[in-house]
């Protein structure tokens, strides 16, 4: 029986057929989740070489570019790492150059939870969060515009064999986005961050 299963699996590999696995992604709201403004959120997949694959979740305002009194160039600084990775233009009058096959919603009051499917491959899961007007003594209104503190990014490696029921992987903090949205790099300098680090209390992936 084991030999038969092994032969079937080998046949699927040779034919390039991959299996899908169900996962649940949850974001626990932190103390600063809605302290000043509702946060903007993007959650997406990359391959292990850092190439963008697809967006799994993004807040409506970021995806629809519906910024209140926002400039015509939009708000690239709101979710700069995601905007650059996905090549989704933040400008209000930009053409819809990217079709988002993702869960999209207004920011929930108490965190986020949704289900999705992944192929049996290795991935990097990234999540970016930002709250506008989140000023402090380091990121002042004079020096940081409407952004306040920069976006914060969390990530985790999802192995190809991640399909065990109730197995959990938690994303860890990996850095910040560009304060002015000028690049899509994850900056490791966290000097001056305060409340931005409490937008979320956890981001987790659970196998089903």
Regions found by a protein language model. Give the residues of each.
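Sec-dependent signal peptide recognition
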Residues: 2-13
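Sec/Tat signal peptide C-region and signal peptidase I cleavage site
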Residues: 15-20
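Short amphipathic, basic-aromatic surface patches that mediate peripheral association
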Residues: 23-36, 61, 135
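Short, solvent-exposed aromatic-acidic interface loops
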Residues: 30-32, 55-65, 170-181
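Short coil-to-beta strand junction motifs in C2/discoidin
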Residues: 36-42
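Structured domain cores in non-transmembrane regions
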Residues: 48-135
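Glycine-rich, aromatic-bearing surface loops/beta-hairpins
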Residues: 114-118, 122-208
């Amino acid at each position: 029986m084991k030999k038969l299963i092994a032969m079937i699996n080998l046949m699927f590999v040779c034919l390039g057929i991959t299996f899908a696995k169900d996962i649940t992604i949850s974001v626990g709201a932190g103390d600063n989740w809605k302290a000043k403004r509702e946060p903007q959120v993007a959650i997406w997949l990359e391959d292990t070489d850092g190439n963008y694959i697809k967006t799994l979740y993004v807040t409506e305002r970021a995806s629809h570019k519906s910024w209140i009194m926002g400039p015509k160039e939009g708000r690239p600084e709101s979710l700069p790492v995601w905007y650059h990775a996905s090549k989704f233009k933040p400008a209000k009058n930009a053409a819809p150059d990217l079709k988002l096959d993702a869960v999209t919603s207004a920011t929930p009051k108490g965190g986020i939870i949704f289900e999705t499917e992944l192929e049996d491959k290795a991935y990097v899961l990234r999540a970016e969060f930002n709250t506008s007007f989140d000023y402090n003594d380091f990121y002042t209104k004079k020096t940081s515009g409407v952004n306040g503190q920069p976006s914060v990014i969390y990530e985790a490696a999802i192995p190809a064999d991640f399909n065990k029921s109730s197995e959990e992987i938690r994303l860890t903090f990996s850095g910040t986005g560009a304060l002015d949205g000028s690049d899509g790099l994850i900056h490791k300098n966290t000097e001056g961050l305060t409340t931005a680090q409490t937008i979320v209390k956890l981001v987790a992936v659970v196998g089903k």
